[in-house]
């Protein structure tokens, strides 16, 4: 072995112990050496740490900017978008480590969304979580039960959030939880036909603890707790809870309180039915929700009450076409992949909106109507050659008639003419 080879054998990486021959590069420092592999590994570790640090300290958008982002995906509901933008901004500003609040403790303000089915409650919460880049989960209040009953514990909500945060506890503790159908756990003693079982109030009691802020013991695999299993501790103090519900009949309770007559010759007529409903909801007060069946302690954990308007037919037409991820745009993209230009007439869009209004399903019903009407077409189009354009008219929606197909040959003939 030559002297040069002996020197190469003696030079080793101070971190991994590999010799100079075993690596591509070996960089020398004062009495230490580092190889190219260790440099690459260190770079990855530093990058991961940097991403984790910047994720929690990224610049928070101002309320106006948050609302602008919501405008791209949620049609109308201006009042609700403003209220949510301010509430979310204040919540995450409170968690901002750069803002000194040691002299004054800023408490968390959870949010209650009230509005009919398909008005955008869930979409608002989902859109907020996506732009804020925080873990998000949706829980159904109707599946929750208090201890001792068959069903899910409230801690399973936190487990779902933890799973969406890839079991990063610190990240989950800054997340957003949306609890849907919250009105279904209300006690309605004045109307026994729609009263939930006795566990309804128990669920409210269990929820208010995690909503206010507690150190929740979460079973990593879900299910009911038992003493032998290990638990993950999650502090819910900084988790933002958004609860949503339709609260059917709440408008009548509000009208009764403000003294408006809803039937008879002396009834106050203010226009369309949805206008009356929207005007009534805007007058909601905590006492109305307590009469509806929410216990005062639970309502106290939801200081911000936001009402959403019932959508009109014109609003539904806008929802079909205007948002960034509008349904019509989604279908057009699917057809574009097949090389077909998909077009809906104005009357077809109005018919879809009208059907959704009749079904009383709001924006949620638009997709099911379109999917039903487009099924045969989406089945046939990939197998048909030469189709360049497809026009969906009113009769396609109403009577499931075949749409107008324009073939490539016909287009060529038009150009020649």
Curated annotation (Swiss-Prot):
Residues binding ATP, per UniProt: 116-123
Q: Which Cys pairs are S-S linked?
A: none
Sorted alphabetically, the Gene Ontology cellular component annotations on this record are: HslUV protease complex
Gene3D superfamilies named among the record's database cross-references: 1.10.8.60, ClpX chaperone, C4-type zinc finger domain, P-loop containing nucleotide triphosphate hydrolases
Chain's role: ATP-dependent specificity component of the Clp protease. It directs the protease to specific substrates. Can perform chaperone functions in the absence of ClpP.
Q: Which family does it belong to?
A: Belongs to the ClpX chaperone family.
Protein name, entry field: ATP-dependent Clp protease ATP-binding subunit ClpX
- Which source organism? Desulfosudis oleivorans (strain DSM 6200 / JCM 39069 / Hxd3)
């Amino acid at each position: 072995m030559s002297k040069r080879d002996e020197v190469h054998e003696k030079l080793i990486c101070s971190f991994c112990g590999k010799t100079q021959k075993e690596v591509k590069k070996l960089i020398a420092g004062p009495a230490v050496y580092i190889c190219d592999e260790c440099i690459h590994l260190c770079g990855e570790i530093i990058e991961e740490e940097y991403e984790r640090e910047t994720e929690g300290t990224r610049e928070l958008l101002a309320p106006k900017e948050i609302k602008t982002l919501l405008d791209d995906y949620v049609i109308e509901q201006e009042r609700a978008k403003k209220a949510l933008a301010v509430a979310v901004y204040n919540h995450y500003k409170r968690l901002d480590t750069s803002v000194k609040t040691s002299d004054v403790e800023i408490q968390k303000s959870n949010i209650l969304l009230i509005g009919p089915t398909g008005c955008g409650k869930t979409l608002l919460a989902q859109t907020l979580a996506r732009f804020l880049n925080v873990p998000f989960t949706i829980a159904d209040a109707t599946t929750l039960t208090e201890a001792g009953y068959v069903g899910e514990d409230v801690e399973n909500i936190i487990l779902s959030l933890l799973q969406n945060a890839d079991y990063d506890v610190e990240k989950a503790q800054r997340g957003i939880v949306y609890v849907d159908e919250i009105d279904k756990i209300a006690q309605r003693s004045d109307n026994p036909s729609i009263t939930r079982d006795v566990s309804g109030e128990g669920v409210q009691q269990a929820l208010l603890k995690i909503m206010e802020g507690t150190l929740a013991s979460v079973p990593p695999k879900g299910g009911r707790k038992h003493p032998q299993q290990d638990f993950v501790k999650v502090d819910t103090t900084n988790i933002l809870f958004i609860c949503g519900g339709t609260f059917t009949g709440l408008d009548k309770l509000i009208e009764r309180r403000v003294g408006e007559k809803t039937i008879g010759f002396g009834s106050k007529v203010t226009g369309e039915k949805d206008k009356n409903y929207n005007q009534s909801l805007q007058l909601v007060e905590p006492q109305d929700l307590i009469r509806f069946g929410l216990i005062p302690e639970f309502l106290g954990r939801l200081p911000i009450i936001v009402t959403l308007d019932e959508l009109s037919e014109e609003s539904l037409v806008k929802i079909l076409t205007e948002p960034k991820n509008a349904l019509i745009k989604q279908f057009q993209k699917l057809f574009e992949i097949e090389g077909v230009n998909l077009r809906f007439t104005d009357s077809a869009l109005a018919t879809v909106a009208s059907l959704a209004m009749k079904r009383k399903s709001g924006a949620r019903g638009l997709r099911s109507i379109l999917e039903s009407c487009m099924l045969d077409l989406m089945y046939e189009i990939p197998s048909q050659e030469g189709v360049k354009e497809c026009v969906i008219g009113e009769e396609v929606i109403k009577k499931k008639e075949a749409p107008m197909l324009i073939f490539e040959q016909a287009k060529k003939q038009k150009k020649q003419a």
